[in-house]
């Protein structure tokens, strides 16, 4: 005897023991009556368990030995007799036994078994006044119905077969029980326990809330429960026998179609034909966004609908649903799979092509109400053909496609997965072509806002690219848009890459959106600077006044501003405008956040970011192919600092003036190098520039030139050879200026020809540089062009004079200190002639202090202690001495 048979036997024994006092039929007549009752019970059970269809497991459950089957049959007969007297208890036991057998059959049967179990638990809990249990079981019941609606919404079953009658019956009865309990509670002498009272109120609120959701169905059920149950059974009778459908799958020519038509394990099919397109679309729209919705299955259904669509209206409707479905493939992935994105781009391009070819159909975000289950065609009203307006947003789909490509590139490591990154980057050209086609469509329909948003996307793709790539993009777009018209960029007019960007940017300047205007001018500035047009880029930046308002702009616009400014500084460096380059780049390199400010990495080590903030920071990062080379920018900045700051450091007289150097970053690097006892050969770009700066300070301009020219990062510039020539020439000139500032104090005059041979510059250039230094008061000298010399004017102390004056000052200070120390040691307070002498000496000391404190230079910086002060002090001292005698 099997385990289940033993359990049934024990149940039979217990039930027979409990029925010992009842009168039971016996003999042949009793046996016939037992069989008749058992048959009736089985028929009732088959009707009651309509939701627990278990035909698939009958052979498995009844394939055991003969004895077990006979035993279970006899148990059923005895229980059928007992049902005459103990209907509720025995039937619940039998249902639980059959549920134990059926619960593993299929997902559908398991869901309905859960519903039956929840309903049974609610009924028992209400009888036992266990409202806490009833509340939890009610939540389970509502979760069941939510899952049930998600799975049945895509089936061909009509609406009257969606909500089970048992569910509605439970809601109605439970609402009545709750109302009865609350009414009894008001007059009861003893109040209900707080937990139960809270549960009852919770059930009442839940029922009140859910009744609004099922208002129509509940109303129909309350009018005639039997009619509703009959309609439900009739609606669900069709898929009751799935075996013929399984056989139909193997028929020739239908196997492939059935693979798309079958949904779930219940054998329910969709009407994937031209006639059922709109109904299926509505069901998909209703199911979208709900929990446990199978997105892959939705995409498969929509793809099949696109294949069977016949009319233009059907294709547009299906494509408007299919493209967002692919873009919303998974909310847990950082970006959609590349294959899904490519397919979505192709389908969106197909949608744009259909709308271009069919001008009678227009997709807009705001349209009037219309029946989405009816085919629509253009109508003639008052002799004019009216367009068919379809609800949708083409510009949102286009921006989503563009953003998804950016996400894909952001999360692809260009170093470790370079080939994959390049493969994904190749799809930018087809996307650009689609953007151009969408722009022509929006221009034809005169959708100004959509045109501006499309043009700014088009600018974003080409503003930072070389001309050859832009020309390739434009040629592909022109071929795809053959026969189309565009007023912004006419396809029949040939223009270079800069002309295309100029036309697009000028169009955005006329837009009403300030954010788009700001970004367009930044794109334009960046492109002008990229081509080395420094003055045009600078003028655009100054005329835009963005530097005054950029702190109030959004983060994306600030990033674009930083990129544009860096490119302008690099353009100035490429043309040899060294002071301008240093001024432009100084603000960026005064911090240690260059890559963060350029949206190329996240470097906030000392700032704690929440996961949401960190995610936002990563989303703002630019793809690798749009990064600016920070090493190149740093090389340009430090080289500019070297050419500007080294002559300035040589011209200052005091340490205080040295601390007023413009670039503190460069000064710090130079001081660190000076403090090192030994500095090895340069290893990186920064080392090359620092060693070149030290060589330039020492007058070794040739060594400095070789170090700067040997920097490898210059090869990234388009005009690398020209830039190296400019730098070599600048180093020669600044080397001359540094030498004049450093050694002018040691010479009375210098030959111009000697300077020309030393610095390998023409005499005319030497004369020009010295003349400019004299004119700006940087150098106190004059030019004697007859003798070809520069004569230095001794308007300041020579080196020997300066050292002699320092020695005299220190000697006088030491003498005064020794005299004070001697007076303290001897305790001599000064009496008689010695006191007068000390007083005279003190007066003379004050005068000497004035002379020492007020010394000046030969430029006339002296105060009271000049030559006149010395004579005055000496005369006073001598006069007092004579008086004392």
Swiss-Prot record:
Region entry Disordered, spans: 1-81, 822-885
Gene Ontology BP annotations: formation of cytoplasmic translation initiation complex; translational initiation
Bias type Acidic residues, positions: 55-76
Signal peptide: none
Pfam families: eIF-3c_N, PCI
Disulfide bonds: none
Domain PCI stretches: 624-797
Gene Ontology molecular function: any one: translation initiation factor binding
Cytoplasm listed as a keyword: yes
Entries under Gene3D superfamilies matching the protein: Winged helix-like DNA-binding domain superfamily/Winged helix DNA-binding domain
Biased composition range(s): Gly residues: 855-872
Subcellular location: Cytoplasm
Presence of the UniProt keyword Cytoplasm in the record: yes
InterPro entries: EIF3C, EIF3C_N_dom, PCI_dom, WH-like_DNA-bd_sf, WH_DNA-bd_sf
Family, as annotated: Belongs to the eIF-3 subunit C family.
Protein name, as recorded: Eukaryotic translation initiation factor 3 subunit C
Species of the source: Cryptococcus neoformans var. neoformans serotype D (strain JEC21 / ATCC MYA-565) (Filobasidiella neoformans)
């Amino acid at each position: 005897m099997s385990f289940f048979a033993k359990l049934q036997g024990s149940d039979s024994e217990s039930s027979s023991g409990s029925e010992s006092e009842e009168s039971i039929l016996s003999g042949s007549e009793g046996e016939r009556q037992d069989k008749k009752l058992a048959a009736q019970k089985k028929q009732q059970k088959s009707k009651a368990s309509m939701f627990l269809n278990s035909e698939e497991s009958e052979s498995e459950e009844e394939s055991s030995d003969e004895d077990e089957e006979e035993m279970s049959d006899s148990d059923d007969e005895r229980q059928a007799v007992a049902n005459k007297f103990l209907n509720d208890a025995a039937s619940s036991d039998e249902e639980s036994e059959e549920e134990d057998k059926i619960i593993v059959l299929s997902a559908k049967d398991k869901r309905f078994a859960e519903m039956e179990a929840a309903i049974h638990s609610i009924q028992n809990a209400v009888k036992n006044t266990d409202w806490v249990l009833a509340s939890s079981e009610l939540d389970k019941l509502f979760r069941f119905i939510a899952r049930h609606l998600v799975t049945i919404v895509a089936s061909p079953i009509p609406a009257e077969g969606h909500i089970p009658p048992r569910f509605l019956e439970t809601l109605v009865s439970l609402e009545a029980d709750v109302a009865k309990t609350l009414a009894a509670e008001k007059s009861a002498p003893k109040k209900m326990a707080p937990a139960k009272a809270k549960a009852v109120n919770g059930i009442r609120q839940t029922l009140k809330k859910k009744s609004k959701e099922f208002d129509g169905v509940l109303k129909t059920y309350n009018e005639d429960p039997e009619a509703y149950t009959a309609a439900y059974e009739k609606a669900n009778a069709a898929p009751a026998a799935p075996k013929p459908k399984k056989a139909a799958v193997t028929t020739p020519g239908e196997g492939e179609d059935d693979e798309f038509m079958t949904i779930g394990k219940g054998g329910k099919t969709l009407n994937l034909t031209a006639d059922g397109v709109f109904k299926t679309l509505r069901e998909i729209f209703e199911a979208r966004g709900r929990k446990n919705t199978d997105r892959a299955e939705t995409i498969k259904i929509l793809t099949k609908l696109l294949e069977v669509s016949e009319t233009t209206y059907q294709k547009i409707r299906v494509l408007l649903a299919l493209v967002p479905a692919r873009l919303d493939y998974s909310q847990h992935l950082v970006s959609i799979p590349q294959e899904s994105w490519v397919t979505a781009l192709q389908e969106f391009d197909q949608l744009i092509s259909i709308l271009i070819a069919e001008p009678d159909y227009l997709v807009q975000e705001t349209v009037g109400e219309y029946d989405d289950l009816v085919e629509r065609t253009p109508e003639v009203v008052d002799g004019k053909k009216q367009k068919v307006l379809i609800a949708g947003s083409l510009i949102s789909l286009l921006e989503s496609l563009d953003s998804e490509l950016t996400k894909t590139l952001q999360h692809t490591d260009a170093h470790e997965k370079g080939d994959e990154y390049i493969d994904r980057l190749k799809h930018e050209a087809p996307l650009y072509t689609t953007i151009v086609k969408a722009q022509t469509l929006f221009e034809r329909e005169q959708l100004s806002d959509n045109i501006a948003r499309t043009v700014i996307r088009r600018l974003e793709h080409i503003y930072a690219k070389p001309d050859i790539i832009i020309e390739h993009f434009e040629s592909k777009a022109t071929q795809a848009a053959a026969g189309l018209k565009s007023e912004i960029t006419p396809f029949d007019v040939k223009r270079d890459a800069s002309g295309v960007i100029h036309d697009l940017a000028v169009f955005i300047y006329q837009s009403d959106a300030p954010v788009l205007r700001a970004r367009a001018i930044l794109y334009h500035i960046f492109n002008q600077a990229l081509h080395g047009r420094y003055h045009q880029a600078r003028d655009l930046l100054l005329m835009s006044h963005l530097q005054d308002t950029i702190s109030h702009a959004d983060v994306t616009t600030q990033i674009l501003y930083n990129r544009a400014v860096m490119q302008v500084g690099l353009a100035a460096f490429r043309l040899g405008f060294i002071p301008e380059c240093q001024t432009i780049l100084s603000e960026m390199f005064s911090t240690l956040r260059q890559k963060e400010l350029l949206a190329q990495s996240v470097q906030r080590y000392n700032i704690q970011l929440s996961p949401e903030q960190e995610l936002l920071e990563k989303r703002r990062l630019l793809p690798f192919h749009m990064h600016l080379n920070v090493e190149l920018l740093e090389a340009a900045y430090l080289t500019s600092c070297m050419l500007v700051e080294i002559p300035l450091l040589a011209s200052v007289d005091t340490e205080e003036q040295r601390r007023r150097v413009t670039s503190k970053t460069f000064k710090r690097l130079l001081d660190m190098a000076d403090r090192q006892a030994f500095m090895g050969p340069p290893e990186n770009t920064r080392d090359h520039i620092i060693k070149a700066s030290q060589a330039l300070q020492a007058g070794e301009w040739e060594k400095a030139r070789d170090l700067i020219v040997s920097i490898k990062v210059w090869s990234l510039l388009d005009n690398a050879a020209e830039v190296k020539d400019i730098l070599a020439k600048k180093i020669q000139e600044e080397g001359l200026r540094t030498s004049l500032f450093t050694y002018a104090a040691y010479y009375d005059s210098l030959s111009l020809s000697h300077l020309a041979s030393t610095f390998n510059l023409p005499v005319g250039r030497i004369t020009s540089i010295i003349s400019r230094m004299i004119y700006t008061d940087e150098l106190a000298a004059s030019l004697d062009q007859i003798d070809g010399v520069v004569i230095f004017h001794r308007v300041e102390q020579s080196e020997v004079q300066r050292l002699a004056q320092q020695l005299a000052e220190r000697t006088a200070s030491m003498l005064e200190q020794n005299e004070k120390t001697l007076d303290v040691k001897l305790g001599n307070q000064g009496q008689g002639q010695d006191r007068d002498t000390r007083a005279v000496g003190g007066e003379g000391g004050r005068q000497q202090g004035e002379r020492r404190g007020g010394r000046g230079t030969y430029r006339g910086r002296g105060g009271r202690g000049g030559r006149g002060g010395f004579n005055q002090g000496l005369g006073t001292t001598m006069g007092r001495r004579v008086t004392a005698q």
